[in-house]
Amino acid sequence: MNHQERILIYGRLGKNPDLRYTRKQEPVCQFTVAENIEGESSPRWHRVVVWGKQAELCTVYLKKGSPIFVQGQNFDREFTTDEGEKKQYRELNADNLGFL
């Protein structure tokens, strides 16, 4: 399943950004964002992935608790565990960030 939708969220980082590099030395940063939705008792959590120069800037300007705007596409990802069980998760592939 690879469902895609474009979204814009505002929230706060749940932990410090994690910067890594692909085999081709392309920077990729991952972090989670907690978005408070009016009428909901607990925040909605988003897994965010950022690529390229923006990924490197995330580790400079962001830390746990930082407010941020994120715009991008949601992707439903699927993987198989070591036990053979199929699992899914949603990931926001960010193309526009607003450091606040």
Write out the residue ranges for each language-model feature.
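Single-stranded nucleic acid-binding surfaces, predominantly the OB-fold ssDNA-binding core
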Residues: 1-100
